C-alpha cells in the first residue's frame, strides 16, 4: 500500500507536491542553481539526486523513467548528455544547499540549491592518494603489532632455552 513520504507535504495535495518537485528539478537542471524556500530545497535534494543517478546509468529504461517526471525532452537530453557524465566518478552528493536568509515579504527562510562541480582529475588523484596513505598507515600499525608479538614470543623462547640449559 502506498504511503506518503515523511515530512510536511508541499503545496497541499500529493499530486501538487509531485508536480512542484518536477518543476523545481526541471529548473535546477536547466539553470544549475535556483533560489527557493528551505523546505522546498530539502525536499528537492533527494529527488534531484535520484534523477542524476538515473542519468549516470544512461540506459533507455532510466531515460524513459526520467521522461515520466520531467516532460521537457531538451532538459532530459541535457541531463543525460552533460550532467550525468559530469558526475560519473562521484558516488553521490550532486547538489548543495546554502541558506541565504529570510525573504523580505513573508520572512520565509530561503536557500540556494545548486549542482556541485564535478571532481577534477587532481581532486580525484588527491582523494585516491589520501585513501592510499590511510591504508598504508593502517597496514603499518597492523604489521607493527604483529612484529611486537613476534619479538615477545622470541624473547620467551630464548628465556625458556636459557633455563633449560641451566637445568641440564
Swiss-Prot record:
Family statement: Belongs to the bacterial ribosomal protein bL17 family.
Entry's Gene Ontology BP terms: translation
Family matches, as Gene3D superfamilies: Ribosomal protein L17
Gene name of the encoded protein: rplQ
Assembly information from the UniProt record: Part of the 50S ribosomal subunit. Contacts protein L32.
Protein name: Large ribosomal subunit protein bL17
Region (Disordered), start-end ranges: 124-168
Organism in which the protein naturally occurs: Streptomyces coelicolor (strain ATCC BAA-471 / A3(2) / M145)
Bias type Basic and acidic residues, positions: 131-168
Cellular component, GO, one term: cytosolic large ribosomal subunit
GO terms, molecular function: structural constituent of ribosome
